[in-house]
Regions:
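Histidine-acidic metal/acid-base catalytic patches
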Residues: 6, 17-35, 40-57, 88, ...
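Active-site-proximal loop/turn and secondary-structure-junction residues that shape catalytic pockets
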Residues: 40-42, 65-67, 100-103, 142-146, ...
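Conserved beta-strand positions in the central sheet of alpha/beta enzyme cores
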Residues: 62, 96, 139, 176, ...
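Glycine-rich, proline-tolerant flexible connector loops at the mouths of alpha/beta enzymes
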Residues: 64-84, 142-144, 148, 246
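Conserved alpha-helical segments that form or flank metal/cofactor-binding pockets of metalloenzymes
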Residues: 86, 95-97
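Residue-level detector of anion-binding/catalytic polar loops
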Residues: 59-60, 93, 136, 174, ...
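Active-site acidic/histidine proton-transfer and metal-coordination neighborhood
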Residues: 20-26, 48, 88-90, 106-207, ...
């Protein structure tokens, strides 16, 4: 099996019985594509992230939607034209738009009804931004509910995603939903939570993903998401983990057995995009971290 990324070709041998064990058909995986996440660049001009992505050999951008760069209201007020220009200049597409929404001032799972409406209005505008940017997905995660009773929490979650899915359908856009670690949320931390939400809301424009830190800190594997979600698993966040927090580290600097996990992901049939998700831990050295992260992943391919 051939796996191509950023001009590098790696050979992986995946035994047929592994695929059969997962009940998946045989096929050739042609490409794993890597994205740069712009969050740690928030103290620098956004153009620096695009320039680095091009120079280091990334395949796409996952755009963090927060100030000063690409906060949804700012994009809709005119800033979007600059992001489109950067995509064209650097030949670097924005494939995922990830609005900031689990910290101040927005969390649709927490607060009063008026605060929920405010958060949803923001996310509805974010969906429009994702569509206008040309992104394939807008990424929505599920924040802390403030220990809301389970029934009320479930109703609020499903109500939120029905509204978002209806708007995405109107825009001809898609949403990818992310679980979080137990250090970030009091619910929605497992692949089964994702499947249950997708099944209950029932819109075909909703998909799931896996941030590999999430299963790792809970004694699970990323491949479990593919077994549970099947073809509805469309995106991946790669970062290493210390195993005891939500900290996202450079691949190879933590405890995740990346080579084995990547092997298993491919055996399960995942051949999509993978954003190397470095966040504020590397806010002082985003360029060096972005370069090191991709180099580390490529060494693991060899």
């Amino acid at each position: 099996m051939t796996w191509r990324s950023g001009g590098t070709t790696a050979r992986w041998t995946i035994e047929t019985n592994k695929r059969e064990a997962y009940g998946l058909p045989r096929f050739e995986i042609e490409e794993m594509r890597y994205g740069l996440f712009t969050c740690p660049y928030q103290r620098l001009p956004l153009e620096r992230a695009f320039a680095d992505a091009k120079a280091f050999g990334y395949d796409y951008i996952e755009l963090w939607g927060g100030r000063p760069h690409t906060f949804a209201p700012d994009l809709l007020a005119g800033q979007l034209r600059e992001v489109l220009r950067l995509q064209e200049q650097y030949e670097m597409p924005v494939e995922v738009y990830t609005p900031e929404h689990n910290a101040y001032p927005y969390n649709y799972m927490l607060g009063s009804e008026s605060q929920w409406r405010d958060a949803m209005d923001y996310l509805l505008r974010s969906l429009r931004c994702g569509r206008e940017l040309g992104a394939q997905y807008t990424l929505i995660s599920v924040g802390h509910s403030g220990f809301m009773p389970e029934k009320a929490r479930r109703e609020r979650l499903c109500r939120s995603f029905r509204l978002l899915a209806e708007e995405a359908e109107h825009l001809n856009h898609r949403i990818v939903i992310e679980t979080l670690t137990p250090y970030e949320t009091d619910h929605f931390t497992h692949a089964e939570d994702l499947k249950a939400l997708l099944d209950e809301v029932g819109f075909g424009n909703l998909f799931g993903m896996c941030d590999v830190v999430v299963p790792f800190v809970q004694g699970e594997t990323a491949a479990h998401y593919i077994r549970v979600l099947g073809a509805r698993m469309v995106h991946l966040h790669l970062a290493d983990s210390d195993g005891v927090s939500d900290t996202h580290l450079l691949p190879g600097e933590g405890k995740i057995p990346f080579m084995g996990w990547l092997d298993e992901l491919h055996a399960c049939g995942y051949d999509g995009r993978a954003t190397i998700e470095l966040v504020t831990h590397y806010i002082d050295t985003p360029s060096e971290a972005a370069r090191q992260a991709l180099e580390s992943i490529r060494r693991m391919e060899a």
